[in-house]
């Protein structure tokens, strides 16, 4: 697996360890920047999920997490497979699996997608020289998340 070998190679190059969380870094500057995360966490009141380990400094993000992960309210039901969704827009997007509809067309080639985010990823990875995906360990950049 390319990703696993990449991670192992990158971890071998890391010699400095954060004494608060155990994360490893290749140079002191990266460790210093990382330690700011721990300082910011201590300065802010953390909102913790009562069902799992999730925590955040923002109440709104906790509310979104609770709805997305722990809510059992799925009022919009797919008539084809019975899967439930919280919002009508999620059901509409899901229905494209059953209908085969792909309304999003690439402006550079024949690629079509049922989802706008998949089209954006396609354009970035196939039609640009951008390298938007960065490895957290070695900081190299890649055009596709599968390469990280």
Curated annotation (Swiss-Prot):
SUPFAM superfamilies per the UniProt record, alphabetical:
beta-beta-alpha zinc fingers
Lineage of origin: Eukaryota, Metazoa, Chordata, Craniata, Vertebrata
Quote the record's domain comment. Answer: The binding of ZFY to DNA is mediated by the interaction of the GGCC core base pairs with zinc fingers 12 and 13.
UniProt-recorded Gene Ontology molecular function terms = DNA binding; zinc ion binding
The free-text function statement in the UniProt record for this protein reads: Probable transcriptional activator. Binds to the consensus sequence 5'-AGGCCY-3'.
What domain of life does the UniProt record list for this protein's source? Eukaryota
Return any one Pfam family short name. zf-C2H2
Question: Which stretches of the protein fold into C2H2-type zinc fingers, per the record?
Answer: 16-38, 76-98
Q: Where in the cell is it found?
A: Nucleus
InterPro entries assigned: Snail/Krueppel_Znf, Znf_C2H2_sf, Znf_C2H2_type
**What's the family?**
Belongs to the krueppel C2H2-type zinc-finger protein family. ZFX/ZFY subfamily.
Protein name listed in UniProt: Zinc finger Y-chromosomal protein
One GO CC annotation: nucleus
UniProt keyword list: Activator, DNA-binding, Metal-binding, Nucleus, Repeat, Transcription, Transcription regulation, Zinc, Zinc-finger
